[in-house]
Regions:
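Glycine-rich phosphate-binding loop signature in dinucleotide/nucleotide-binding domains
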Residues: 1, 101-104, 156-162
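Substrate-recognition element of Asp-dependent hydrolases with the DxDx(T/V) motif
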Residues: 25, 92-121
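Substrate-recognition "cap/lid" segment bordering the active-site pocket of phosphatases
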Residues: 85-87, 113-173
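Helix N-cap/coil-helix junction residues
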Residues: 34-36, 62, 126, 158
């Protein structure tokens, strides 16, 4: 089967957002009296914001009442940081042009919310090339579960076996 579709992750691959997620999480957790070390933060890199917040709230016995508020605040702070100091990763426009000129179907599959995916597409200047986007935000399982990639492939009317996927994060063992 010939490859005819390419699906990209977003955070850390298209935009340098990981440090911004770290900053936003640090600011929000500080409100709850928690300071995460770099090692602690990196041990949960790749989790969806909801899972990240739930994990650390459990670890620090912060209770369940504030989960949704903390998650919302982190997302709002990341969006503001992306707008003011977000950076597009080197080579993004080149690689999108490469696949676009070869008539590949192109999609983005991310754990981030759709609003952030839309902002990243705008920042990268790739709106005309992206034909589908999928978020794992409301899926039963986040990455590394492949559902978000399968959903994106379905949106592109692509056979998953004909897809080339670019992903930079793997959860630790």
């Amino acid at each position: 089967m010939q490859l005819n579709t390419v699906i990209f992750d977003m955070d850390g691959l298209l935009i340098d957002s990981e440090p911004l997620w770290n900053e936003a999480a640090a600011e929000v957790f500080k409100m709850y009296g928690v300071s995460l070390s770099d090692e602690q933060y990196h041990s949960t890199t790749g989790l969806r914001t909801k899972e990240f917040v739930q994990w650390w709230f459990r670890q620090f016995n912060l209770g369940d009442a504030e989960h949704a508020r903390a998650e919302k605040l982190i997302f709002e702070k990341v969006m503001m940081k992306l707008e003011t100091k977000g950076k597009v990763m080197p080579g993004v426009q080149y690689i999108f042009r490469f696949f676009y000129e070869r008539n590949f179907k192109i999609g983005i599959a991310s754990s981030s919310p759709i609003g952030m995916i839309d902002l990243a597409i705008e920042m990268c200047g790739i709106k005309n090339a992206v034909q589908a986007k999928a978020s794992a935000e409301n899926l039963p399982y986040g990455k590394p579960h492949p559902q978000v990639y399968l959903d994106c492939a379905t949106s592109l009317d692509a056979d998953p076996l004909a897809c080339l996927c670019f992903e930079d994060s793997f959860l630790p063992d």
